[in-house]
Amino acid sequence: LLDCGLEPGGFTVRYEGYLQSIEIVIASNAGADAENFACIKEAAGYEIVTFQDGEMSAAYMDYASELARPEMMVMYENRLKETGLWNGFPSREDFGSLREFAEALEAHAGIEPASALRVSGDGILFDPPGDSSDFVDFVERYSNLLAVVAYATTKDRLNFGFIGNEKIAD
C-alpha cells in the first residue's frame, strides 16, 4: 500500500473476526484517490478494503464491481443455461417501467408476478411472502428467481436488495 502512494499511518491492516477476513481501512489522511484504486486492489488481493470517507468507499466499490462484472456475467449466464432459463430471457429495454420488468423476471423464473419482487426507487427488492418457514421449500421456490435477478441486475447495472433480514436476528 505504501508503494501505491498511501501515507504511512493513513491505513490499518488487521484481521477482523466478525468478518473472518483481513480488513484494510484507509483513512482520509492516507492520500488515496481514484488514481490509486488499481494499485490498492492489486495490493489487497481478495481482502476487504474500506475507506473511512463514504464517497471514496462507494467509488472503490464501483471500481471493484466493474472489475468483477465480466466474470459474474459468465457465471450467471451458465447458471441460467443449466436451469433452462437462458432462452427467452426478458430484456430491460422491452419494458416501460422497472416494475413491469421485475414482474417479467418473476414470470420467467416461474414465480407469480408481483409476489416476491417489488420496486423501490431505482432498485428491485426481494420481498417474498412470509408463508414458508421451511428453508428447503424456500430455496427450491426462489433459487431460480434469485439467479434470474442476479443476471438481470448485473447486466443492466440495477440496484438489488433484500427485505426481511430482521428475521435473522431472532
Task: Provide a role label for each language-model segment.
Residues 1-170:
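Long, low-hydrophobicity, acidic/polar, solvent-exposed interaction domains
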